[in-house]
């Protein structure tokens, strides 16, 4: 990654080691809590790797577990300790957390991660937050960004982050 001229590098996790993308899993045959425990443990390992700029769509599996399948799953308190450890490492390593708006236009109906995690990140000293629409179609480019910026303000942020040459640039939320 260091040999290429990227503006920023996202870290994301779509599947657990040795498994398919969360999109393809049969949640009727899975222990959801075990999957989520493994997911957050693997995210923690990725954050320890430190070769990225922004952690993308934390809570990605909830798009399918809660959004598509309607299976209730708790972030706090069930996975709060490891989530806090992830957020703490992001703060310590001056990394951004992405507020991904794709869940707003899907059955989930909320951002990834949800607003309470964004607030927690801010409370822990989080400074850098990127915002992305996770567009896989041209019509979704920028979808939900205005709502996302409003959520950032509510969480205590007055700026969001873009990257130029892998260096963070803070822009005011207007």
Predicted stretch roles:
Residues 17, 70-174:
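Charged catalytic cores and adjacent phosphate/nucleic-acid-binding surfaces used
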Residues 1-92:
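Extended substrate/RNA-proximal surfaces in nucleic-acid metabolism proteins
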